[in-house]
Amino acid sequence: MKTLYVFLLCLYTSLTVAAQPLCQIKHFSVNSGLSQGVVVNIMQDKKGFLWFATWNGLNKFDGYTFKNYKAFPGDGCTLTTNRFSYITESKDGDIWCKSYDNRAYLFDIQTEKFIDILLPIESSLQQTNTVSNIYTLNKGITWITCEQGYAFRINEQTCKEGKDIILYSSFNQNLKGNKIFDIYEDSDGDEWIMTDKGVTIIGKKRINSDYPFKMVKEYNKRIYPVSY
């Protein structure tokens, strides 16, 4: 009888555990504080906050509530649209944002304001750039690549004042090709820019090849350019 009791107890416990859901799913919507139902990108920052790129602003979630950041008429915000297509975190914890109209902004988490990073240099170039990608490197450098064949190397610590934003392109002969496939920072801090006409390296290393490598892999301090 004791054996039967133990068996039934184990069976009940197993059934109870099996009946528990594997995970809890909670749904969030505009009714929960999300500024828009279309979310195109999600990231978690170093402090654990979740950030959402939506079609109506940038949203920050602390686990309980949403805080929305966007432009309003007459508020002086530099945003040309509240639609975002991509976000990523800088080394210092600010948020890089690519907007729906292909502009690049840095959201300063201290001032809670958007900075149109390329605006100062575009004034000197007398042209507006169409942003393709944003690459953040571990050492605090960000690359913004554009469809026109331009790439901008940005120092995250000084770019908010419009400083240390350097133009790279095949036109001024410091970039091999017009189309950039990938940008990689190796373990020595050298920066590899993979273009359609070869590799440009910012650092001590050199490579003599015009082959259009698409990406770089590193293993045991050895660099392997990859094509596919």
Predicted regions span which residues?
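Carboxylate-rich, polar loop motifs that coordinate divalent cations or form catalytic acidic clusters
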Residues: M1-Y228
